[in-house]
C-alpha cells in the first residue's frame, strides 16, 4: 500500500512534539502591537496545542 502524501499547507502550519502533541502558531501577530498589552503580545508569541476535536484530521493531513 502506498504512503500518504503530507499536505503542504499543513506541514507549514503544524508541528508534532516529541511527546506527540500537535502545536500551531497563534493568530493576530502581524501588526498593531502598540495597541495591545505586553502580556497579550507575550501570550500570542507562544505556540498553542491543537484542540482534541481537530487532532485526528490534522494527523491525517501530516501523514502520521
Swiss-Prot record:
Gene3D superfamilies: 4.10.410.60. SUPFAM superfamilies: L35p-like. One of its GO terms (molecular function) is structural constituent of ribosome. The keyword Ribosomal protein applies. One of its GO terms (cellular component) is cytosolic large ribosomal subunit. GO terms for biological process: translation. Keywords: Ribonucleoprotein, Ribosomal protein. Signal peptide: none annotated. Residues 1-64 are annotated as: Disordered. Pfam families: Ribosomal_L35p (PF01632). Belongs to the bacterial ribosomal protein bL35 family. This is Large ribosomal subunit protein bL35. It comes from Beutenbergia cavernae (strain ATCC BAA-8 / DSM 12333 / CCUG 43141 / JCM 11478 / NBRC 16432 / NCIMB 13614 / HKI 0122). The gene is rpmI.
